[in-house]
Amino acid sequence: MASTKMGALNETECTFEFIKVAASQTLTKGELCTVDASGNAIVCPTNYAGATQTYVIDEDITTAAGETSRVARFVKTGPCAVKIDAAVTEGATIMPSDATAGQIEVFAGTNYNLMIGYARPTEVGGTNARIEINKTR
């Protein structure tokens, strides 16, 4: 069954970071994000080979052109519901999607730098999945 809640699922088990959001961004709760060269949050690009800093945004936020002072809360590690672009199976290792920015998919291939966590045993499927982000770099 798909989770109806996006973002952090258990705040006591999560590690959060508060990050400035880049200008001209619309980030929705449950999207996979990363930071740009300036350290501002953006939607994670497809098949993001440099997935050294990935987060799941825990709130909806929209920034205007030139606006870089708004801060949002992101899940760095722990259980959260995130948008998926394809079916995710229980226990599967997950990575940034190679088809849809801001979403995840089951890990495939040999580039282990893409792995960001694994699917939790419940609430898997539908348009979002419960995952455990356990990669910290």
Labelled PLM ranges:
Residues M1-R137:
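Glycine-anchored, exposed beta-strand/edge motif detector
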